[in-house]
């Protein structure tokens, strides 16, 4: 499985102490250099900068792909992550920002955000969704109530199927 991550999901998963769910869920996660730079930026939280300074073995750092000028409306990390996901024919792109998600979906990429990762971790028995969500709310993560309802319905439906 090829999974590419943008800055947002990694940032929030580090902040809530749940970044370790990525390895059992996806085995390996690939990030472009632009995402590494955003995670290591002076404006990034100290915990995030510390984490990316010594990335786990399952996090594969890649050079940025050639720039796609049609994506100049996105920030550098989103643009590089989306372009890398396209170039590698990724199975999934981890991205939170709505404009980037919409563009990725328009390009027929499968997207999952921080909340989706937490839902998958819950369904895999790795984390309690409500506890993870409470931690996420203690950050500056913006969560629309409709999105939360949708994810909760997805969790309930998946539990019924199993």
Feature-to-residue mapping (PLM):
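Active-site-proximal, substrate-binding regions of enzyme catalytic domains
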Residues: 1-92, 98, 105-109, 146-162
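Hydrophobic alpha-helical interaction segments
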Residues: 109, 113-155
